[in-house]
Amino acid sequence: MSFNHQEIEKKWQAYWEENKTFRTPDETDKPKFYALDMFPYPSGAGLHVGHPEGYTATDILSRMKRMQGYNVLHPMGWDAFGLPAEQYALDTGNSPAEFTEKNINTFRNQIKSLGFSYDWDREVNTTDPNYYKWTQWIFLKLFEKGLAYVDEIPVNWCPALGTVLANEEVIDGKSERGGHPVERRPMKQWMLKITAYADRLLEDLDELDWPESLKDMQRNWIGRSEGAEVHFNIDGTDKKFTIFTTRPDTLFGATYCVLAPEHALVAEITTEDQKGAVEAYIDVVKSKSDLERTELAKEKTGVFTGAYAINPVNGEKLPIWIADYVLASYGTGAVMAVPAHDERDYEFAKTFDLPMKEVVKGGDITKEAYTADGEHIDSAFLNGLNKEEAIAKMIEWLEVTGAGNQKVTYRLRDWLFSRQRYWGEPIPIIHWEDGTMTAVKEEELPLVLPKTDNIRPSGTGESPLANIDEWVNVVDPETGKKGRRETNTMPQWAGSCWYYLRYIDPNNNEALVDPEKAKQWLPVDIYIGGAEHAVLHLLYARFWHKVLYDIGVVPTKEPFQQLFNQGMILGENNEKMSKSKGNVVNPDDIVASHGADTLRLYEMFMGPLDASIAWSENGLDGARRFLDRVWRLFVQENGELSEKITDAPNKELEKAYHQTVKKVTEDYEELHFNTAISQMMMFINDAYKAETLPKEYVEGFVKLLAPVAPHIAEELWSKLGYNETITYASWPTFDESKLVEDEVEIVVQVMGKVRAKLKMKKDASKEEMEQLALEEVKEQIEGKTVRKVIVVPGKLVNIVAN
């Protein structure tokens, strides 16, 4: 007999909604637990089976913690600004707001059909003006602190999309969306000074309970380097440029210098003879993305400018080249090249037949660059020193002579914060005709995104907002001065940087979050989501959180105490699920055919939560069969409780039950859901063999199952005679003493050969062991004389007989 999942799931979902079962009260003396999911972008495709994997994991924890007496905050919302809605609007002429609202309604219904225990009264939507009022407020605070500024920088301009793209949105020189060509062009952009927080973003990682691999990704992205800046004069001019190097000890080995093609000095120093070649080269570089110029570049390219730099340490003339592997946006946009001791410089020197000069002993520079430590040679006052000593000595020399200084740099760049799109938060800034700019007053927030039918890109590089005259043009009521609103909008990252704070206090019109509530709920106890957000989203959210900490809005330095990346659910053929491959599994179909509880159980049982695993219909059927077995064990054909269930204890199930409570509880805490489910399956096997089932064990088992399969658990709970939801029933406990084996297996040997194995009491005496063993091997020793019996208590009896 099978249970009717459609009936049961609808019934309990209606009950939870009606009774607001999962509403989180703020005032409580219970300890808190804040479980956060990465909120989804509500795409037109709807929910896919990858979403519920992480959501089920946090839901299991949330449901267990409620039963353990915690006040649990487990919310859901929508990261709803962004390119796809705008692209849809461009393609169809419909409004992105309507498209987004329709998608959100679909997502909400799908998520509710899976039985997650969210407090829907706290739902947030990044496109709601009452929400983005506070996104804009945070921007004003960044602006006040000097952390938001305008800069002219080379950006990835995509003419077809009419917008600037972030580096992540450019793949092989083409836009990720649509595969359109992308070129580099300088434009005025809003930047956020995340580099001002680089050290803190790095150091505070140590205090977090995050996977080490993820912390390393953040560390590498921030990329702290210690070294020196060195100033090079340009021969025959009064101009100079500065380079940064982590190996100032190799300055005597420099044989040429390289500037980024965009470097401001290039046009000024290039000689007449080289002008044509330099301009042609710069033209080619324009269309390449940073990634193509550096990591993806197969061969080194470059051109000599005709100019020379003077090495400050020995006065030698070094030819100045330009090459695309040096980026204007990275470091100083200039490098000194030491081909004997740097692999990239070595390749470049080999390609263009440039000289090399060995200054550190230990390698063979005819074969490759030598980058390890060694004794310095041909380096005047550094001769005989090792790397560490030579670096310190050279920095001292640079500082005394004024030729340079000690310096720490970061790979991290400031955050490009403007988008030339319509569907984003307006940036609350006004540019006046006299060249000044001011922030919109706080009391005038939210600066609402105007409705418009014309959201085509302006084509000038400005956003479609530039087309809406009545919105863009403003007049200062006090001075009559004319101005224009900022037409760039914020990136999709903005709204997702702080949403976890708004869940704490979603309806507050006076503040982003009430400080008392922030103190109560922060930091987030566990944050679960996909690894694709391991760097940027988490880095940006940590940056904003630290700014809010500095201005007293939040009480903690870090937002997320524990973080976990779920794996990916692949198609049955082990490929990534995608519409084009036709291997996407729709959760709605599974909920209809197998039930939400089955889907939840299956996704948790597939394997470790962080592994990427292929979807399997067989596995799904197996998960349903297990739930059917549970149902049949506890419920008769007529829907009544099984007659096996009794108030009397059952010694034979005692150990299995206490073991199950212990293992499932510990595994849930550790996010080892697959092994917890395995343990529950073993218990059900034992329970089928038992004559009777103590009601206490049945109730305990149903509570353990509830976080994974809440609908069937609620139904069983009501059949066990309870009128209230299982949500706040107390979590089962185990007794350590019941886990101890009171019987042991004894090996019986005759003349050293194993003849029998016996179960006996753990604390049996030597005499009892000997007596039982002799009884057991009576036949084997018949007609023989027992010479000696060796007894090892609790382990072995060896009989010597001949």
UniProtKB/Swiss-Prot annotation:
Amino acids binding ATP: 579
Enzyme kind, highest EC tier: ligase
PROSITE patterns the UniProt entry points to: AA_TRNA_LIGASE_I
Keyword Nucleus included in the entry's annotation: no
A molecular-function term among this protein's GO annotations: leucine-tRNA ligase activity
Known catalytic reactions: tRNA(Leu) + L-leucine + ATP = L-leucyl-tRNA(Leu) + AMP + diphosphate
UniProt superkingdom: Bacteria
GO biological process terms, semicolon-separated: leucyl-tRNA aminoacylation
A GO cellular component entry from the record: cytosol
'HIGH' region, short sequence motif: residues: 40-51
E.C. no: 6.1.1.4
Keyword Cytoplasm: yes
Compartments, as annotated in UniProt: Cytoplasm
Keywords for this protein: Aminoacyl-tRNA synthetase, ATP-binding, Cytoplasm, Ligase, Nucleotide-binding, Protein biosynthesis
Cross-referenced SUPFAM superfamilies: Anticodon-binding domain of a subclass of class I aminoacyl-tRNA synthetases (SSF47323), Nucleotidylyl transferase (SSF52374), ValRS/IleRS/LeuRS editing domain (SSF50677)
InterPro entries (alphabetical): aa-tRNA-synth_I_CS, aa-tRNA-synth_Ia, Leu-tRNA-ligase, Leu_tRNA-synth_edit, M/V/L/I-tRNA-synth_anticd-bd, Methionyl/Leucyl_tRNA_Synth, Rossmann-like_a/b/a_fold, tRNAsynth_Ia_anticodon-bd
Motif stretch ('KMSKS' region): 576-580
Name of protein: Leucine--tRNA ligase
Origin species: Bacillus cytotoxicus (strain DSM 22905 / CIP 110041 / 391-98 / NVH 391-98)
Gene this protein is translated from: leuS
